[in-house]
């Protein structure tokens, strides 16, 4: 929501929308298939990504479901079931940092930082040909999801929490 993020005001004052910048999010992973990140935005796309442990950029089934200009890479240090608070101290790392079905906190954080936004019709805000610097708060008021502060930035996602929780034990590995 732009009223909270003030992205439009930032773009107006600085002229910067994240172009040429990459941001790393160390959290629960990223749903890179979401329309907010230029992905297909469908349940089927998400399930396909969720069922893979391969690098999403090289997995032929998954790579076509994401925007390679937005998603630059990442790694899953935790695995879906890792949660030391619940007695599972054994991470099961893999190359796919997809945000699991347990909460999507990492996806939310990434959206606030650098999501494209999602228009009222469900399409990615990346499809707006006017460019972010020309948008006003009124333009994006009807969107389902407002753009993040740096919508033209790329993302690296590092999953350090399991799908249902965890501790900060794996953060240093991701850094």
Predicted segments with their positions:
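Autoinhibitory N-terminal propeptides
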Residues: 1-9
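Subtilisin-like serine protease catalytic core
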Residues: 11-168
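Aromatic/hydrophobic pocket-lining residues that form the small-molecule binding cavity
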Residues: 171
């Amino acid at each position: 929501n732009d009223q909270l993020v003030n992205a439009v005001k930032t773009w107006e004052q600085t002229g910067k929308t994240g172009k040429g910048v990459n941001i790393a999010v160390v959290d629960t992973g990223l749903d890179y298939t979401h329309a907010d990140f230029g992905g297909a935005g469908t349940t089927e796309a998400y399930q396909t990504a969720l069922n893979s442990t391969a690098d999403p950029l090289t997995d032929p089934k998954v790579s076509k479901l994401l925007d390679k200009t937005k998603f630059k890479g990442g790694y899953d240090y935790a695995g879906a079931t890792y949660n030391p608070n619940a007695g599972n101290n054994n991470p099961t790392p893999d190359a796919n940092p997809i945000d699991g079905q347990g909460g999507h906190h990492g996806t939310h954080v990434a959206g606030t930082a650098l999501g494209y936004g999602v228009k009222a019709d469900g399409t990615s805000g990346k499809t707006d040909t006017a460019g972010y610097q020309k948008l006003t708060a009124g333009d994006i008021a009807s969107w389902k999801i407002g753009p993040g502060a740096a919508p033209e930035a790329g993302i690296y996602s590092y999953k350090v929490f399991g799908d249902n929780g965890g501790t900060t034990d794996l953060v240093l590995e991701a850094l």
